[in-house]
Swiss-Prot record:
Record GO biological process: negative regulation of host-seeking behavior; neuropeptide signaling pathway
Modified sites of kind Pyrrolidone carboxylic acid: Q23, Q56, Q80
Name of encoding gene: HP-I
Residues making up the propeptide: 35-55, 68-79, 92-128
Gene Ontology cellular-component annotations: extracellular region
Gene Ontology molecular function: any one: neuropeptide hormone activity
Signal peptide: 1-22
Subcellular location: Secreted
UniProt lineage: Eukaryota, Metazoa, Ecdysozoa, Arthropoda, Hexapoda
Residues where Phenylalanine amide is found: F32, F65, F89
Keywords: Amidation, Cleavage on pair of basic residues, Hormone, Hydroxylation, Neuropeptide, Pyrrolidone carboxylic acid, Secreted, Signal
UniProt organism field: Aedes aegypti (Yellowfever mosquito)
Protein name per the record: Head peptide
Expression tissues: Expressed in the brain, terminal ganglion, and midgut of adults: numerous neurosecretory cells and midgut endocrine cells. Expression is dynamic depending on reproductive cycle.
Length: 128
């Protein structure tokens, strides 16, 4: 019973504080809820100082599209690597039964596996 009563008292006090804060005239409030006559504390940094600090920072690597220049370099490097043995379904071409439920199939019944394995060269052979 006492716990319930103390929770009710805390909620009423909080509601009263919010009500009193809302009743203050807007001229005494600042953007951050601090009154204009209160002195700023030592750890409070004003917006003007923050804007000056951000203006002093060197520009970041991000472009206007949100990508860094380093990301484009990584894409070029990954494009130079040889294709992996994984197919687009996440199974290895070298071991088609790696998941355990897939039946063993021949290359004739599933021609896309050979295309993925050999990449562009096989597509050129198939076109000729």
């Amino acid at each position: 019973m006492w716990k319930f009563a103390s929770i009710v008292v805390l909620v009423v006090c909080l509601a009263w504080a919010v009500y009193c804060e809302d009743q203050r005239p807007p001229s005494l409030k600042t953007r951050f809820g601090r009154s204009a006559d209160e002195p700023e504390s030592d750890n409070y940094v004003s917006n003007d100082i923050m804007e000056k600090r951000s203006a002093q920072r060197p520009p970041s690597l991000k472009t206007r599209f949100g990508r860094s220049e380093g990301a484009e370099v990584m894409e070029k490097r990954s494009a130079q690597r040889p294709p992996s043995l994984k197919t687009r379904f996440g199974r290895s071409v070298a071991n088609p039964e790696s998941d355990g439920y897939m039946r063993k199939r021949s290359a004739e019944s599933e021609p896309f596996v050979t295309r993925i394995r050999h990449g562009r060269a096989n597509k050129k052979r198939a076109a000729n």
